[in-house]
Amino acid sequence: GRRIVANLTVEENLLLGAATGRKGPWTVPAIYQLFPILQERAHTPGTALSGGQQQMLAVGRALMSNPGLVLLDEPTEGLAPVIVDQLADIFNRVADQGTALLLIEQNLSLVVRVAHRYLAMSKGAVVAEGAVDATPEGMQALAAHVAV
């Protein structure tokens, strides 16, 4: 799950991520710039947010620790397409800020919008890897390795 702390507001949940004390570009104002809806809901309990907003909060909280790498495990699962589109844009902005993203995802349209390289696994073994190719041929080759 997203591990949103029920008794804490959106802002308090974000501040939990800063507990590492690591300095970097990700601060509460930077997260609010990335996710304006979180600023609007700053004093709302984190668990009162929609699923998409909770996912934004979870990503924002992870960024607050100013990591070199963020692991995103199926971050768009169960989310509306409009939220998936927003997250794709946000993931690209995060990467542009110098934070590496490791994306575990079956949504190929998201993969080709966000990833530069892919690695496909089956039963714990790597079965394919390479540069992400958004052409129809590249999508077909990538889709051959994804079972939903």
Residue ranges and their predicted role:
Residues N66:
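Conserved catalytic motifs of ABC-family nucleotide-binding domains
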Residues P45-L49, Q53:
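Conserved ABC ATPase signature
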Residues N7-W26, L34-Q39, H43, G130:
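ABC-type ATPase nucleotide-binding domains, specifically the catalytic core motifs of the NBD
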Residues V70-E74:
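Catalytic Walker B motif of ABC-type/P-loop ATPase nucleotide-binding domains
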Residues V84-Q97:
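Helical segment within the ABC ATPase nucleotide-binding domain
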Residues E105-Q106:
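H-loop/switch region of ABC-family ATPase nucleotide-binding domains
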Residues Q33, A120-E129, T135-V148:
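C-terminal boundary and immediately downstream tail of ABC-type ATPase nucleotide-binding domains
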Residues A62-L63:
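ABC ATPase C-loop
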